[in-house]
């Protein structure tokens, strides 16, 4: 659901990575623009995934453990810290702001009374929105339902994400029963954000320091373990000044390919995300501004689809490009032009870069990469002078 959209963006490459990722590593350009660091995993783990790199180089995400559970982590100064859970086995940190406040979702030890598996871990435990501060995990309220999650946090500690209501959505396939809505948390209070038209469900994916929130709304669908989402997002949305703005689309109107969804907004009001193309069979990354509206960012040459996940203050966009076989490459867009990030790294890079999930104001990037042995790890790509 909700935050699992971002997990899809940063983890969807796993199916094709083992077969194709390392073969492509030898094709890098000799031009040096980034030094890549493998941030590794928690002890005993074999997989990690990132979601945000803040302007102090702190990365939020999750790592597997020796028992294959997944725990929220922060990487800081080369050190990985397990943030823990709310008593259950799994958690993910989808966000960290520049003051070090982290947020995400964490399982409790209590079974969901409706048998739902909201966070997709397969445990059917209640999974709550959570903030990690001062070494502890602090749950946030829902909108009357049992589950939710934080996707982003701005500098002032206002969080954006998703939460269930107490109302059932008859369109939701089992095991999901309850509606879920976009939400902002301010001073510990959950504030429901409106969805577009008659859309029953939605989620907030990003928030900037001015309180502008982005996300999407649509209809509940079956949880897809490959896409890690059960929202068919029909409308990409912006919430600002108490007003809902439909950002439009690139021709696709049903959300059946991947959907129309805004993932991030910078402090200049520039929005990035994904939109289905006409016919709703494939999707492209987009950049939206108030002046130019939605623009198609395209793909790497020859690829079939793309997604834009993050944008920094200078307007550099990162995400991924996908070929017809589902293989992915990390992408950076400058001036609307996509470049394979693997062509900009040192030949000694320890990883082939599958996705770019976040970029900070200094241009440092985090995402998923694959090692020579086939493990998928979090990386940090640091710009270097030529």
Predicted segment positions?
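Residue-level hotspots at or immediately adjacent to binding/recognition sites across diverse folds
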Residues: 2-386
